[in-house]
């Protein structure tokens, strides 16, 4: 009796990143990698400016670039291409969906100011962008959260709100 073994193997075709769906996968980046990347971004900006306000402006501009891209990606992924047009809904989108995508968790609070009906605060008790950056004494007023402010500004601008932030 002669038994032949037949082996069939399926060879997966190689797919490029352009072939993957936008709705697939939410990649995670390690905290140490994120910290290194962000500290290098701050150093890059620091080497190209002379004052702390210029540095914060540069970080805000870079954050805005991230914000525009994240808005497009998350709107396609989460909302099926439909953008929110009401302020509170956009702010809740930023607090939850955007924050989870960027920092792995929601922002701690979204508060409405008592004295001004047009002022809202997104509160994060321990900001990831300030956690791993040591500020030199000569740049004591530097707040690296201006990067995140740029992201929020871009999302609000992309949602059709007038640029009158901060």
Where are these regions (language model features)?
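C-terminal non-catalytic interaction appendages of large macromolecular assemblies
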Residues: 129, 138-166
């Amino acid at each position: 009796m002669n038994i032949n073994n037949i082996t069939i193997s399926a060879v997966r075709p190689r797919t490029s990143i352009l072939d993957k769906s936008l709705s697939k996968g939410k990649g995670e980046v390690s905290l140490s990698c994120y910290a290194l990347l962000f500290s290098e971004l701050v150093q890059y900006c620091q080497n190209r400016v002379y004052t702390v306000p210029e540095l914060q402006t540069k970080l805000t501009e870079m954050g805005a670039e991230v914000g525009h891209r994240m808005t497009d990606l998350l709107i396609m992924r989460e909302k099926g291409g439909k953008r929110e047009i009401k302020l509170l809904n956009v702010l809740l989108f930023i607090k939850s969906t955007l924050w989870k995508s960027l920092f792995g968790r929601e922002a701690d609070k979204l508060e409405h100011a008592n004295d001004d009906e047009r002022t809202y605060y997104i509160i994060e008790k321990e900001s990831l962008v300030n956690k791993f950056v040591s500020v030199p004494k000569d740049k004591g007023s530097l707040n690296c959260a201006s990067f995140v402010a740029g992201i929020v500004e871009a999302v609000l601008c992309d949602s059709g709100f007038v640029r009158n932030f901060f």
